[in-house]
Swiss-Prot record:
The keyword Phosphoprotein does not apply. It is found in: Nucleus. Belongs to the protein kinase superfamily. Ser/Thr protein kinase family. This is Serine/threonine-protein kinase pdik1l-A. It comes from Xenopus laevis. PROSITE patterns: PROTEIN_KINASE_ATP, PROTEIN_KINASE_DOM, PROTEIN_KINASE_ST.
Length: 339
């Protein structure tokens, strides 16, 4: 980072997205490996995505092993560097908030604004790469299902709706001994929403399953039918996770039209056309999904749970806490996937 006494040494670039670059870095004082994401704030949409991620991760008062942890956020303007805190009245921070709210740059465009997020470093790529480069493993599937349901329950408990759950946004940290299953971390909170309390008791935490959102966002193959309509709650995250788990268990893949990369994702086939599950259910809520596609890919309880998670009616889906409990029961009470 740009400072008279840098805290981090950037080692190499490990990823590049639409609004930022991610580096592997070392903490100078401890030699700890971290990931540093640099976001250039030259466009209002970049600022909004960055601030959404910052607000979501900084709102969490505790850590969870399966949710990416943000160590700190540093704001850089030209030669000035300042640690950014949520709710700050800093003259550097407020123009970014104004930019996000108005949708237009609220600072001198000649200034170079950057945000630096310091987060956990994950050395195993993303879930998509990990699953598709290895043979199917019941042990891995079970571990990943439990980790992801635990992460989602934690986020919803903290009033955060992710809104873009997909394998590309789930990072993998390899186990140190190479024997245990890797640790997953839900990441990329640029589209997330922190639900605030309202009504008669503002001190009471918001119920994410009753907080309705209207901005249709996410990635089409993981979007719930109600998201396409623009009227949804946290149950949309349950649907997205249902698509992910279904695709993981049966190795169902789609092809990214831009990169030609194979991705884990469920779909409905219409002749030669591949249609996102949510879009198909929006058009026909009574559509019966073919789960499982492969006869012995899952047991009866898992089949029933996936049908519930992928229901066209959000009220018929379990909430994140019910889902976590159901998956624990499936993992530890069922000894075979064929019953």
């Amino acid at each position: 980072m740009v400072s008279s006494q840098p805290k981090y040494d950037l080692i190499r670039e490990v990823g590049r997205g639409s609004y930022g670059v991610v580096y592997e870095a070392l903490v100078r004082r401890t030699s700890q490996r971290v990931a540093v994401k640099k976001i250039r704030c030259q466009a209002p949409e970049n600022v909004e995505l960055a601030l959404r991620e910052f607000w979501a991760l900084s709102s969490i008062q505790s850590q969870h092993p399966n949710v990416i942890h943000m160590e700190e956020c540093v704001l850089q303007k030209d030669g000035m560097v300042q640690r950014m805190l949520h709710g700050s009245s800093s003259v550097l921070y407020l123009p970014l908030v104004e930019t996000s709210l108005k949708g237009e740059i609220a600072f001198d465009p000649r200034s170079i604004y950057c945000l630096w997020f310091v987060m956990d470093f994950c050395d195993g790529g993303d879930m998509n790469e990990y699953i598709l480069t290895r043979r199917p493993s019941r042990r891995t599937n079970t571990s990943f299902m439990l980790q992801l349901s635990s992460a989602l329950a934690f986020l919803h408990k903290n009033q955060i709706i992710h809104r873009d759950l997909k394998p590309d946004n789930i990072l993998v940290c390899k186990s140190r001994d190479g024997v245990d299953e890797p640790t997953l971390k839900v990441a990329d909170f640029g589209l997330s929403k922190v639900c605030s309390s309202s009504g008669l008791n503002p001190e009471e935490p918001a119920n994410v399953n009753k907080s309705f959102l209207s901005t249709a966002c996410g990635t089409d193959f993981y979007m719930a039918p109600e998201v396409w309509e623009g009227h949804y709650t946290a149950k949309a995250d349950i649907f997205a996770l249902g698509v992910i788990l279904w695709a993981m268990l049966e190795r169902i893949t789609i092809t990214d039209t831009h990169t030609k990369k194979r991705l884990l994702g469920g779909y409905v086939q219409r002749g030669a056309q591949v249609v996102p599950v949510g879009e198909a259910l929006l058009e026909n809520p009574k559509l019966e999904l073919l789960i499982p596609v492969k006869k012995k890919s899952m047991n009866r309880r898992m089949k029933q749970l996936l049908h519930q998670m992928l229901s066209a009616n959000p009220q018929e889906r379990p909430d994140a806490f019910q889902l976590e409990l159901k998956l624990i029961q499936i993992a530890f009470r069922d000894y075979t996937w064929e019953t």
